[in-house]
């Protein structure tokens, strides 16, 4: 019988959480009812609503040098260090941009890591992404990093079709690899690939429960990054899992026992939902959202980092020391140094941001700039003409 316990957060009595065990299956569950492949995916609802649970502290993590490089020509070492400097300045003294993630495979990758570490910044903390092997764990330790990302694909699409394994086999393999990481003293960040097509309560939650047991055993924090690899996540209240972002974050936090400070959301923009889903992850209990500058990433890209700067400010009521003028400086650097021109209608950085051509809007701006201006955009557009001058 489940015990009745006091919830210290809500100060209400509640039943002890159900213990979710791995559901091993002979055939993959591909949720064909939601993902028919020959048709557009379906968004279904069961109207199970979970409560808002935004952590006291929320932050942004950066993936510009990892996912951001997988869709373009690699950055040079000098370019990486320059962009890292900009990220440090943008994140402000409180380090709202908390971490930045790097490859370690090539000499150029490692040189960039060493040079960024030489800067001595507390934030963004330099972290890595590696293959799940003992040799790579030792590499992370030798470089002096405290945390690394490890890919742990969790949908049956990956488990059965890519890895040719069963759920139990793959879970045992993952736990063995993560234990090896912990043995070296490195804090693992488990990247739950393709979570929005995964069996949340049949695999993801039981796996994360085991991660929390390892954390207790080794006294080393284990983070989980919920990766919406294909951009299927939706933010609508009452949507069914595995597409429900609120449902996923609630499950990780409440049923798997992963603290908010160790939950991070990684979004893709295939259905134009990267920003909304990332904000939703904050609202329902994830402290971290993982972003790339200007959304540069695989396929349609990742969550734009600059967008989440302004989502943060709107939710918290303050920029908390973030220097948003750096966003314009970065955009200009990307154009001049890398030849990357922002699409003209991109919020905050496109050439049409804060520009109006409609006569009635122009008349309003000339009378009072607040009428058709979203806020004092001098916060962003240092060195550029004001909206009144750009009418």
Explain the meaning of each model-derived region.
Residues 2-134:
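N-terminal capping/small domains of soluble enzymes
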Residues 10-66, 318-390:
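A mid-to-C-terminal "edge-of-domain" accessory segment
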Residues 55-60, 73-95, 115, 119, ...:
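Alpha/beta enzyme core
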Residues 60-63, 95-102, 124-130, 148-150, ...:
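Hydrophobic faces of well-ordered beta-strands that scaffold small-molecule active sites
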Residues 66, 103-107, 129-133, 153-155, ...:
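Active-site beta-loop-alpha junctions enriched in small/polar residues
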Residues 73, 102-103, 126, 130, ...:
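Hydrophobic alpha-helical scaffolding
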Residues 230-373:
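Catalytic alpha/beta core domains of metabolic enzymes, predominantly
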């Amino acid at each position: 019988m489940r015990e009745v316990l006091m919830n210290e957060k809500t100060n209400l009595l509640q039943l002890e959480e159900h213990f979710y065990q791995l559901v091993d299956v002979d055939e993959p569950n591909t949720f064909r009812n939601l993902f028919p492949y020959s048709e557009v995916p379906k968004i279904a609802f069961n109207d199970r609503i979970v409560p808002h649970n935004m952590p006291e502290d929320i932050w942004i993590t950066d993936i510009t040098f990892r996912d951001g490089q997988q869709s373009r020509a690699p950055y040079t070492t000098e370019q990486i260090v320059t962009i890292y400097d900009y990220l440090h300045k943008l994140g402000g003294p409180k380090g709202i941009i908390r971490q930045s993630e790097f490859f370690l495979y090539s000499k150029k990758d490692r040189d960039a890591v060493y040079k960024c570490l030489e800067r001595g910044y507390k934030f963004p903390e330099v972290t890595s992404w590696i293959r799940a092997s003992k040799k790579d764990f030792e590499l992370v330790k030798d470089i002096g990093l405290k945390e690394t990302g490890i890919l742990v694909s969790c949908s049956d699409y990956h488990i059965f079709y890519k890895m040719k394994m069963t759920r139990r086999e793959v879970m045992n393999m993952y736990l063995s690899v993560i234990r090896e990481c912990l043995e070296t003293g490195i804090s693992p960040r488990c990247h739950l690939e393709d979570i929005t097509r995964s069996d949340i309560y049949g695999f993801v939650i039981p796996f994360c429960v085991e991660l929390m047991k390892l954390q207790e055993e080794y006294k080393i924090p284990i983070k989980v990054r919920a990766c919406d690899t294909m951009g299927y996540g939706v933010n609508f209240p009452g949507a069914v899992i595995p597409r429900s972002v609120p449902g996923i974050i609630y499950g990780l936090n409440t049923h798997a026992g992963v603290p908010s400070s160790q939950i991070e959301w990684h979004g893709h923009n295939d259905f134009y939902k990267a920003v909304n889903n990332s904000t939703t992850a904050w609202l329902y209990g994830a402290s971290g959202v993982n972003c790339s500058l200007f959304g540069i990433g695989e396929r349609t890209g990742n969550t734009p980092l600059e967008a989440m700067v302004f989502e943060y400010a709107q939710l918290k009521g303050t920029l908390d020391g973030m220097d948003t003028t750096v966003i314009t400086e970065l955009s200009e650097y990307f154009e001049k140094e890398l030849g990357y021109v922002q699409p003209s209608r991109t919020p905050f950085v496109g050439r049409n941001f804060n520009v109006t051509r409609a006569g009635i809007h122009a008349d309003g701006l000339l009378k009072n700039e607040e009428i058709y201006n979203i806020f004092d955009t001098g916060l962003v557009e240092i060195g550029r003409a004001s909206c009144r001058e750009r009418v």
